[in-house]
Amino acid sequence: MASFISLSSKSASWNASSCPHPSVQPFVTRKNVVRYHKPTSSEPSYSPLTTTLSSNLNSQFMQVYETLKSELIHDPLFEFDDDSRQWVERMIDYTVPGGKMVRGYSVVDSYQLLKGEELTEEEAFLACALGWCTEWFQAFILLHDDMMDGSHTRRGQPCWFRLPEVGAVAINDGVLLRNHVHRILKKHFQGKAYYVHLVDLFNETEFQTISGQMIDTISRLAGQKELSKYSMSLNRRIVQYKGAYYSCYLPIACALLMFGENLDDYVQVKDILVELGMYYQIQNDYLDTFGDPNVFGKTGTDIEECKCSWLIAKALELANEEQKKILSENYGIKDPAKVAKVKEIYHALNLKGAYEDYETNLYENSMKAIKAHPSIAVQAVLKSCLEKMYKGHK
C-alpha cells in the first residue's frame, strides 16, 4: 500500500489528568495515536483512496461532539434553566450531526496529511473540534436554507422548523448555531497564534455564503417573471458563493491554519478547492431532480421553487424554442403535473449525459491541476477531497 493512516486497534486508556483539556477525557492517547506512513522514494505518489481514517474515527469524532455540546449547554455566559438547556441540546442533536460529516472529517484528514507524523492528544482533539466547527456552521446554513426554500425533509427526517413545537423559533436557533462556532473557537483556540485568522476565515466564509444565498433568492424573483434570465454564468456565481467556499475551501483552510500556514500562500489551492466546491453544489442540483429521496434523505424542490439550478440553466442552453416555451410555462410552479413536464424536457435533452460529461471533465482537469502542485502532502489533501465527492450520485 502506497500510503495509509491508521489508528491502533488497542483501546484507549482514559486519563483525564493527562488531557490538555481538563474538562474532557482524551480520545487519542500515546498508545492509541494517529500514525502516518510516508512513502519511500520507490513508492508511488499518494493514493487518495488509501488516505482515509480508521474505522475508529467516527466514535472518536462523536466523543468530541459530545464534549463540545456539553460545554455549550453549560456555557457560563448564559444562565440556562432546564427547559432552555433541553431545548438547545435537542436542537443541536437534531441539526448538527446526522449527515456524512465530510467537512468535519476533512479537517482531521487534511491536518494529518499535512503534518505527516503522529498527532499529540491536543492536536487530535483540536483537529476534531475544528472539524465540528465546520459542521456547526453548515447546520446554521442548512437550517435557514430549509426555511427559505420551504423544504420538508433533511437527512431523512422532517426539517427542524417543520416540527410543530418549533416553527419560527428555528430562526433564532439558526443564529444560535452560528454563535456556537465562535464559542467553540474562543474556548479552545484563543491562545493559538492562528486564532484571529480562524475567526476571520469563518466570518469571511459566512459573508460569502449568505451573499450567495441572497443571489439565489433574488434571482428567483427575476426567473419567475422571465425564465430566460437564468444562465450557466448565473448558476456558476450562485454555487460559487452559496456553497463552494464553506463546503470545500473552509475545511482545508482550517487544517492549513492549524498547521501554521499562511493562506495567502495557497491561492492556487483555493482556486482548486472552490472549483471542487462548485462541483459539489452542481452535484446537489443534479441529485435534487435525479436522485432517490430514500437514498439521499431529501425531497427535491428546485423545480417547484424556481431555482436557477445547473439543470435548468443547462436546459435553457440546449433547448429549442418549443422546449424553452414549455419550460417557461411550467418551471417554478408547485404542481406535480407541471414538474413532470419539466422533467420530460430534462430527459429529452439528456441532461444526465450532459452532467456526466461535466463531471468527467471536472475530474480530469482537477486532477491535472492537483498533480501540478509542488507539495505531495497538499496533493494528497486535494486528491482526498476530490475522491470524496466524485460521482457521489452513484
From Swiss-Prot:
Locus of motif DDXXD motif: 145-149
Magnesium as UniProt keyword: yes
EC number: 2.5.1.67, 2.5.1.1, 2.5.1.69
Textual note on the cofactor: Binds Mg(2+) or Mn(2+).
Binding site for dimethylallyl diphosphate: R154, K242, Q281, K298, K307
Any one GO BP annotation for this protein: farnesyl diphosphate biosynthetic process
Positions of isopentenyl diphosphate binding: K100, R103, Q138, R155
Protein name (record): Monoterpene synthase FDS-5, chloroplastic
CC terms in the record's Gene Ontology section: chloroplast
List of residues binding Mg(2+) 2: D145, D149
Domain notes from UniProt: The Asp-Asp-Xaa-Xaa-Asp/Glu (DDXXD/E) motif is important for the catalytic activity, presumably through binding to Mg(2+).
Pfam families: polyprenyl_synt
InterPro entries listed in its UniProt record: FPS1-like (IPR039702), Isoprenoid_synthase_dom_sf (IPR008949), Polyprenyl_synt (IPR000092), Polyprenyl_synt_CS (IPR033749)
Required cofactor(s): Mg(2+); Mn(2+)
Binding site for Mg(2+) 1: D145, D149
